[in-house]
Amino acid sequence: MRFMAGESKQGIRAGAVVMASAAAVAATVWGVATLVEPGKAATQQNVSRSTDPAGGAGSQPQGIPEGIAHGSEAGENAVNITIDDGPDPRWTPKVLEVLQRHDVKATFCMVGPQAKAHPGLVKKVVAAGHRLCDHTMDHDTAMDKKSVAYQERQILDAKELIEEAAGSGAKVEYYRAPGGAFTPDSRRIAAAHGMRPLGWNVDTKDFGKPGTAAVVDAVKREIGNGPTVLFHDGGGNRAQTVDALDQVLDWLKEQGRPTGFPVRTTP
Ligand SMILES: [Zn+2]
């Protein structure tokens, strides 16, 4: 989950694996908790400054619910493939190639400055029929502890950069908080700007490079948690991710599981 931005890239490399592991554990807990009780954790953390006392039961005028999406538009049996922390000039093209080979559409959760730095990749993602998701400006996994104004800038500045990079009027359709650090406010801001808050149910833990087999096994073991699977195309060497994604897509086909996009307008 840890996104290493520009100037700090070298200084924190040694600690990145440990931090990524901790984030992955937290993320899994978060995903399962959310599956059982949607929105509860975020409501407890942020109730004092929430402007939405219903804790996400609301829906914005354009019909985008504030609640975190876990379902698939492609039906109950479908799986949503989501790809985080890119785009990355080395690994995003490899991920795109695997998806194309399997004729699978995925949702790419991009970090604003990465999109700005690699607009050609954003355009490729859109041209291949995938969907865009806002993964903030700085991938601050503690943003849920910060001001609403800060959260708003993290979300809306990234949306602007991603859409500028995409061009052709392409829209960012989802918002995923880094490390699952959603708040009622951030969900409201996202929904008000046409972006459905998007969670995950299966963390493949690919970020920590546990080996291709471990990444594949995580999907097989945890797909019963829910339909949305988390992979990464950013944050370092993603060779295991590319291989594991290829195997997972073979396995899903064998299992008769279609793939699709996360729900946007249904609760
Ligand atoms: Zn991330």
Regions found by a protein language model. Give the residues of each.
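Compositionally biased, intrinsically disordered low-complexity segments enriched
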Residues: 46-47, 136-137, 234
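Hydrophobic alpha-helical membrane segments, chiefly transmembrane helices and signal peptide h-regions
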Residues: 18-33, 131, 198, 223, ...
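Generic signal for short, ordered secondary-structure residues
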Residues: 11, 77-78, 104, 169, ...
